[in-house]
């Protein structure tokens, strides 16, 4: 982003996305800039309803279950709203430290998903279940997907796979669709393929 001329502001990891959003709002007000607010704009889920969701039902003959991570909630909400019309059951994946499953909020290393509060446009009626994943499982899957499938994904994708695998144990059969929303190229400066929970992941 810096190479493209962006003014990059970093916030404390302990502040989570709430801290990042606060910094963005302050910046927008100070410099009369546009704050896109993916966490509050209905354009976020609507974009997925009219693109990804329709693509899934057009290209796949049948879907029984949909599994996706939730950060802003845009992907899950937009896709789940559409899939409910097809009697698909929809499941959220979150890391430990996210509050969607009722647990306490704390820092986690799985990036791109996890919420300190319930996203404003995430309708609870769309949610058929929530899987809370350990960071280590997410990163183990990052390495597994690279080694076995040649997929270079990020930790939120590893968590999504873990959620799909956990669901598979429960349902025995049926078509499960999940989303890999990020690539490992975004995290090459970190130890993404050699993650250890006991080490600092910076």
Locate predicted features.
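A glycine-rich helix N-cap at a beta->alpha junction
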Residues: 1-27, 198-202
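A short, charged, Gly/Pro-tolerant segment at domain boundaries
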Residues: 39-44, 177-188, 193-195
């Amino acid at each position: 982003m810096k190479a493209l001329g962006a003014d990059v502001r970093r916030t404390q990891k302990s502040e989570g996305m709430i801290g990042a959003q606060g910094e963005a709002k302050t910046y927008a007000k100070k410099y009369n800039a546009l704050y896109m607010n993916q966490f509050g704009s209905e354009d976020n889920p609507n974009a997925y309803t009219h693109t990804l969701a329709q693509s899934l039902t057009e290209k796949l003959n049948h879907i029984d279950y949909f599994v996706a991570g939730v950060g802003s909630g845009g992907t899950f909400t937009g896709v789940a709203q559409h899939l409910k019309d097809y009697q698909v059951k929809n499941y959220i994946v979150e890391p430990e430290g996210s509050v969607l499953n009722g647990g306490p909020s704390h820092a986690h290393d799985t990036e791109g998903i996890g919420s300190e509060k319930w996203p404003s446009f995430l309708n609870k009626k769309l949610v058929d279940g929530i899987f809370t994943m350990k960071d280590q499982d997410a990163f183990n899957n990052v390495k597994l997907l690279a080694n076995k499938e040649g997929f270079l994904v990020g930790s939120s994708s590893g968590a999504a796979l873990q959620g799909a695998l956990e669901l598979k144990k429960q349902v025995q059969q049926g078509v499960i669709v999940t989303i890999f929303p990020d690539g490992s190229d975004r995290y090459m400066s970190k130890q993404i393929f050699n993650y250890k929970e006991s080490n600092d992941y910076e």
